[in-house]
């Protein structure tokens, strides 16, 4: 006997403290995460933290301060118009105005030359190591905003991504699957529609979730159970990239010595800090990108808290205590 499997086609998502759905103007982390379904960058970063081409089909470093970017004009905006080089220039110009969280990405960009409809040359004021990683900001359409102020426009933003904005109505935003998405054959969504409900405060969102008005939300609240209880829902924990750390002034006579910094590292009980301060909701790390990263080498990781190792590290290098 075969059981019929019901495929969920719609999803209700909650977001609090909403500002704008425009990815270049929003400062809301949850909005920016959703925007990745709608808008796309020239380059993405994969699960191993390596760069992958997205809207760009080529990215070439032609000198220490210049890059040639080629795009695919077959990538289409929501209205069916093609992605063009002018869109890249337009987006970077908007970011240079300094009103976006992505503005830092183009801080060293001094100019964008349009070589043809599918090619731009990006010029930098100085060499930026791994500049390709800066090209992860969403691209916006130039022609769509002709004749108006991008920062105050009331138009519904459009992108080239997997989903498109169908409607914005008060405290509700509806996204629908982009059936003409350029990458649909490789990475299609099983969800057809996403209903986004907006809340002025996180407390309202929690209450709405408990009442069953939304299906999913994300939070960094480590005491979440105090607000929504412990039953009636499933929780998925996702490791983030934010971390607390101790920074050393390596120009100091003593701290400039590697053995001193290493000894201090051994002497700090990070596991106890996670337990007593963060209620075991965080994990210890020896490297800023210690998972899913091709640069991470487990062989170089310290053994963690070890007072005896801390002392022996100092003694082995001629220190007395």
Model feature map: region roles:
Residues 57-99, 115, 121, 254:
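Aromatic- and charge-enriched surface segment that lines or borders ligand/interaction sites
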Residues 256-321:
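Append "and occasionally in soluble cytosolic enzymes with long acidic Gly/Pro-rich linkers
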Residues 60-62, 104-146, 167:
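Surface-exposed binding/hinge segments that line
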Residues 28, 135-189, 193, 203, ...:
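Gly/Pro-rich hinge or "lid" segments in bacterial periplasmic/extracellular proteins
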Residues 14-63, 93, 158:
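N-terminal lobe/hinge region of extracytoplasmic solute-binding protein
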Residues 7-17, 66-70, 88-91, 120-121, ...:
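Short, well-ordered beta-strand elements
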Residues 72, 176-182, 238-263, 267, ...:
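A bilobed periplasmic-binding-protein/Venus flytrap-type ligand-binding module shared by bacterial periplasmic
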Residues 181-226:
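Ligand-site clamp/hinge motif
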């Amino acid at each position: 006997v075969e059981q019929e499997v019901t495929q969920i086609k719609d999803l209700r998502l909650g977001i609090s403290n909403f500002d704008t759905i425009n990815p270049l103007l929003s400062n809301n982390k949850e909005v920016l995460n959703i925007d990745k379904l709608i808008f796309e960058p020239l380059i993405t970063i994969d699960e191993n933290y390596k760069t992958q081409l997205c809207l760009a089909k080529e990215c070439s470093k032609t000198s220490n301060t210049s890059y040639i970017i080629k795009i695919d004009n077959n990538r289409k905006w929501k209205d069916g118009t093609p992605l063009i080089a002018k869109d890249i220039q337009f987006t970077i110009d908007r970011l240079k105005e300094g009103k976006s969280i992505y503005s830092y990405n183009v801080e060293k960009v001094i100019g964008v030359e349009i070589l043809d409809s599918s090619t731009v040359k990006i010029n930098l004021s100085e060499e930026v190591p791994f500049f390709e990683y800066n090209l992860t900001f969403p691209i916006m359409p130039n022609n769509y905003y002709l004749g108006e102020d991008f920062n105050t426009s009331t138009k519904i933003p459009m992108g080239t991504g997997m989903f498109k904005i169908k409607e914005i109505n008060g405290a509700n935003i509806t996204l629908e699957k982009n059936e003409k998405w350029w990458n649909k054959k490789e990475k299609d969504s099983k969800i057809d529609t996403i209903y986004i409900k907006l809340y002025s405060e996180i407390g309202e969102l929690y209450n709405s979730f408990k009442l069953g008005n939304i299906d999913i939300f994300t939070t960094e609240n480590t005491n979440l159970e105090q607000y929504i209880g412990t039953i009636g829902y499933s929780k998925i924990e996702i490791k983030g990239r934010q971390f607390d750390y101790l920074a050393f002034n390596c120009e100091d006579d003593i701290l400039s010595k590697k053995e001193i910094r290493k000894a201090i590292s051994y002497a700090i009980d990070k596991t106890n800090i996670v337990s007593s301060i963060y209620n075991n909701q965080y994990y210890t790390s020896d490297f800023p990108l210690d998972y899913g990263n091709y640069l991470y080498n487990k062989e170089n990781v310290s053994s963690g808290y070890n007072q005896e190792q801390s002392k022996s590290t100092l003694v082995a290098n001629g220190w007395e205590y």
